[in-house]
């Protein structure tokens, strides 16, 4: 099996790629720079806006894992260009050059409504107003109507393997999150486990939420990495915001190896 991985040099991709290689997956990457890659990985130079590079990248692959995305920028045009137009280009290249390939797209828990009455479910109506989740939802819809063999994995707050993401909460959380807000979480190990299940066809034709077993308060997360946050007993605007219902994933066979962020801390996996 040869798999194309986009976003291989990003936060998730740099941790997923070596795990795929260790699992015996032959990997190809779409990269712009000269970042070091694991032995045996075949780089294709280019990006999601280059038709020639995309054709070369997808030709001969059995599957595509599409991680590449733009977020945490004020450049909304860039968000839409990369997340929607780039995804659309990759889908078109796959239709033309690898129509039987399995296409796995990474997406986000931010798609779910701010005022949800329960943890986000895959079949909930979604109409996000922020550009990042709105662009990801638009890309999801492009894939779902493409005629390809697709699956979509929605991830919540990703952490672990010393990626620095938890540490960033010490700067991001104050003023943005209520300290009692609980976030669904997923460790990089379990992203890899979900990706391998997707490559085997477990999630074909489905949107699937992938998270661990214990949404954790922002207050606890900040303290876990040595930060501090002003406590509050004020009511939460919506206690379900950024939480996901993962019942479907469990029914389909996904079980997180890292069940909680506290387990990760105890096992030095942060």
What is each stretch, according to the model?
Residues 141-189:
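NAD(P)-dependent short-chain dehydrogenase/reductase
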Residues 49, 78-89, 130, 134-137, ...:
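Glycine-rich NAD(P)-binding loop of the Rossmann-fold in SDR/ketoreductase-type enzymes
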Residues 6, 30, 64-68, 103-109, ...:
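SDR active-site strand-loop-helix element
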Residues 194-241, 245-246:
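Mid/C-terminal beta-alpha module of Rossmann-like enzyme folds, strongest
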Residues 88-131:
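Conserved Rossmann-fold NAD(P)-dependent oxidoreductase catalytic core, especially the SDR/UDP-sugar
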Residues 229-270:
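C-terminal amphipathic/interface module of NAD(P)-dependent oxidoreductases
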Residues 3-23:
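N-terminal Rossmann NAD(P)H-binding glycine-rich loop of SDR-like oxidoreductase domains
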